[in-house]
Amino acid sequence: MLRSLVSLVAVALFAALPAPPAHAQAAKKLVRIHTAGPNDVNVDNTMLAVQFADYINAHSDTVEAKVFPASQLGQSREVIEAMRLGSGASATTGGPAEYASFVKRLGVLGLPFLWKSYDHASAVLDGPVGRELEQDMEKAGFKVLAWSVSWGYRNVVTAKKEVKQASDLKGLKIRTIPTKVFVAAINAMGANATPMNFGEIYTSLQSGVLDGYEHTAATTLSFKFNEVACCIALTRHLMDPTFLVFSLAEWKKFTPKEQEVMTTAARAGADTVRSMAPAREAEALAAVKKAGMKVNEIDTGPLQKAAVAAQDELAKDFGAESLLAKIRAQ
């Protein structure tokens, strides 16, 4: 009898307790966003990641997004490997080159002198070429949510010699990233591509081992290369698109409504980054001029013609001849 009375009292007390708020009944699903970029929204990939996360956090009651900049979750290669298996990071922002070992045809997006403008790149990536590559990515275990562009074309920067015309590049030892595309791009311009680790650029310019390197104006200032280099020739030979990629295994764990919010978030973030690209590039070029560097516009027509053969050869290697034809035609 006493035991029954105690049970009845306990049930009554429990029933009288206030119900927990809806948000406390189920923890939010966490989206972990990897980017190799620093914790600085003045960097394109970091800006894309932050815009994506902020939109999700403002528009979803069931999903929380958090950015992990500066490779906090690991180096990009290992992060991407884990994403294929549905572990570690949920998504990344970065360049297609990071995924090219999984989807070879992505290499076509990094060909020299491929992009006529930021608008050209955006139109191509929003069209049939982008859709084909998205299908390739899904087969490899990844979901592309949005494409964007880098903040700045890569140009040739020299230590002592001022490059005023295409022929001035002939024979110059120019540091490149040690990949086939970058080496082919520099050699096609008549310079001598010199593959080298990024950390060796400064001292190699000082010592004369290098005549120059190729990169964006923003990078030149960030790493103080203006202290050992004099001039920038606006070759605009490469511009890497960027994209926001989700683990396909992870993506399937979200409801259609949650997926819709994240897709909208990615596209809104990508649009913001795209819209800022021309101004950010102009700001960086103005800053290097202010720092005392000479910036020369040059006729890139001869360089573009010389790069056609390299484009053809590389596209064949990537199995992307049809994609290259579509990009050229657009």
Model-derived features: positions:
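Positively charged n-region of N-terminal signal peptides that target proteins for export
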Residues: 1-4
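N-terminal secretory/targeting leader peptides
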Residues: 25-120, 129, 135-330
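Bacterial N-terminal signal peptides
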Residues: 7-16
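Sec/Tat signal peptide C-region and signal peptidase I cleavage site
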Residues: 18-24
